[in-house]
Structure formats: structure tokens, C-alpha cells
């Protein structure tokens, strides 16, 4: 059976889709057959970040409503042999996303015929239908937050939903929760403009999976249709690679928590 991981948050604009793209890509680069599903019906951004928007013919709702097969709707990634994208619909009503339909998709992806090992669910923000469907079947959840009070507070609400409205919760179990902090700037934390990692951990009380530093490279990668994890010697890329390692049970020291110390020459010449 495939492991189902939902990337979620209480607030929009925290980098969920960027994170979903890089985590799915990172797992595929490690050799795992991975599907990443866009649950944001009506908006659809995952295909843009993955650089496959011109190859979308069918979408998740087409599959759920029997208008296309999974094989017809899945888009093979141009960079990773083991990675496939299932886009959301831009035109359908969100109510078309049914629990029975999503369950059928998950079962087919997990089955022997398709043989996916990981399914990454890119959830819309908040508690709308797409978000509830994305998290319902999750084995694990990556709760994504910016180091801002409103973002962290809204993430706390999502934790409550995971603990009460997921399939695992209904069965008396629990979804394994991870905390991912995005757009983190130690310099801004030092100035009191952002919450610190410790502040966020103290509020949410879930294990820290990783810290993604604030970086223009993330925006540039998204605009070019390539997940930032593909970039070499870029802090955000290295941070996502660390996240993949920790998801797979490997020990990695937390990085990017402190401000980068400038060399003597950079300080001297203002670089």
C-alpha cells in the first residue's frame, strides 16, 4: 500500500504547493514511485510549479466522475522517471470532490497494477471541501506554516481537524503529524519581526520536520516550472532534501536556523 501524505495549512500563501512539488520530486529522486495530487479545485497551481500546465488534458474530477481513467489523467514528470502529477479541475464545483471518488483514486494508485509507493496530497488552505478530502485518507500530515502569529494560529485549527475528522481518527488511530516552517529568516527573527522556531514549536507541540529558509530561488523556481529541490547549492533546495531524508527515517541535523555569518571581506565591502 502507498503511504499517503497530505501537505496542509490553515492559511493560504505559506508555500504548500511549492512544498508538495519538492517533496514529491525528492521522493521520486530517491527511487520511490510517487504521485502528487492537486486538491485545490477551481484554482489549480500544482501543474504550473511542476511545469506541465500545457500537458493537462484530464483532471482529478474527470477521473472521479468516470470521464477519464487515471492512466489518461496522470502526467509523467519531465525530469523524474518515477513521478506523476494528477492536476485539479479549474472549472468544476468543489462539491464534485466526493469521499467515495477520492477513495477510489487512492485505492487504484495504491493497487498492485499501478504500484505507487507515495501519494502526496497538495491541499488547499483552511477547511473547505478540497482540504477535508485531501486530509481524510492521510497516513501522515505535513503542517506547513510561516513564522507569523496568524499562520501558526490557523495551523493549530488544522491539527484539531486531523485529530478528529480523518479516517484514521474515526478508526481510533491518529495521523502522524510533522511541522514544516517555511520562509524562515533568522535575521528577521532577531529583529522581532518573525516568530522563532522555538516559539512555533511551543505553540503547536508537534515534531519539527524541517525549516525552509526565505529565498528568492523558491519564487524563481516556481515561475520557471521547476521545483526548487532540483537546484544545486541553494539553501532552500538543501533544506527540502533534509526534509526528505527525515521523512525516510534518516537523521539530519537541523540547518538554516541561524543567520549566515558574513566573511570579513563581505562585511568590509557591504556584500
From Swiss-Prot:
Kindly state which keywords UniProt assigns to this record, in alphabetical order. ATP-binding, Cell cycle, Cell division, Cell inner membrane, Cell membrane, Membrane, Nucleotide-binding, Septation
Family matches, as Pfam families: CbiA (PF01656)
- What terms describe the molecular function in GO for this protein? ATP binding; ATP hydrolysis activity
Which domain of life does this protein belong to? Bacteria
Q: How does it sit in the membrane?
A: Peripheral membrane protein
From the Swiss-Prot or TrEMBL record, state where the protein is found: Cell inner membrane
Sorted alphabetically, the Gene Ontology BP terms of this entry are:
division septum assembly
Record's GO cellular component terms: cytoplasmic side of plasma membrane; cytosol
Q: Can the keyword Ribosomal protein be found in this entry's annotation?
A: no
Q: Name the protein family.
A: Belongs to the ParA family. MinD subfamily.
Query: Subunit structure, per the record?
Result: Interacts with MinC and FtsZ.
Question: What else is on record for this protein?
Answer: Present in outer membrane vesicle formulations which are used as vaccines in human.
Q: What does this protein do?
A: ATPase required for the correct placement of the division site. Cell division inhibitors MinC and MinD act in concert to form an inhibitor capable of blocking formation of the polar Z ring septums. Rapidly oscillates between the poles of the cell to destabilize FtsZ filaments that have formed before they mature into polar Z rings.
Q: What is this protein called?
A: Septum site-determining protein MinD
Species of origin: Neisseria meningitidis serogroup B (strain ATCC BAA-335 / MC58)
Task: List the top taxonomic levels of the source.
Answer: Bacteria, Pseudomonadati, Pseudomonadota, Betaproteobacteria, Neisseriales
Task: Give the gene name.
Answer: minD
Amino acid at each position: 500500500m502507498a503511504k499517503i501524505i497530505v501537505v496542509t495549512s490553515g492559511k493560504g500563501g505559506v508555500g504548500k504547493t511549492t512544498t508538495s512539488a519538492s517533496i514529491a520530486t525528492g521522493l521520486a529522486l530517491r527511487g520511490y514511485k510517487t504521485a502528487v495530487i492537486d486538491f485545490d479545485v477551481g484554482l489549480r497551481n500544482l501543474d504550473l510549479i511542476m511545469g506541465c500546465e500545457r500537458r493537462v488534458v484530464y483532471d482529478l474530477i474527470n477521473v472521479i466522475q468516470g470521464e477519464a481513467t487515471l492512466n489518461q489523467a496522470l502526467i509523467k514528470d519531465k525530469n523524474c522517471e518515477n513521478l506523476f502529477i494528477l492536476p485539479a479541475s479549474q472549472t468544476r464545483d468543489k462539491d464534485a470532490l466526493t469521499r467515495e471518488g477520492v477513495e477510489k483514486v487512492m485505492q487504484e494508485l495504491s493497487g498492485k497494477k499501478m504500484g505507487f509507493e507515495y501519494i502526496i496530497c497538495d491541499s488547499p488552505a483552511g477547511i473547505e471541501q478540497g482540504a477535508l478530502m485531501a486530509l481524510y485518507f492521510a497516513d501522515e500530515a505535513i503542517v506547513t506554516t510561516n513564522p507569523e502569529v496568524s499562520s501558526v494560529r490557523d495551523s493549530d485549527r488544522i491539527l484539531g481537524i486531523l485529530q478528529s475528522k480523518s479516517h484514521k481518527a474515526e478508526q481510533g488511530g491518529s495521523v502522524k503529524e510533522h511541522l514544516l516552517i517555511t520562509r524562515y529568516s533568522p535575521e528577521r527573527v532577531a529583529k522581532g519581526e518573525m516568530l522563532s522556531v522555538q516559539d512555533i514549536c511551543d505553540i503547536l507541540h508537534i515534531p519539527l520536520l524541517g525549516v525552509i529558509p526565505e529565498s528568492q530561488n523558491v519564487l524563481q523556481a516556481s515561475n520557471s516550472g521547476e521545483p526548487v529541490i532540483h537546484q544545486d547549492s541553494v539553501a532552500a533546495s538543501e533544506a527540502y532534501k533534509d526534509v526528505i531524508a527525515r521523512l525516510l527515517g534518516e537523521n539530519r541535523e537541523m540547518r538554516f536556523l541561524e543567520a549566515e555569518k558574513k566573511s570579513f571581506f563581505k562585511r568590509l565591502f557591504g556584500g
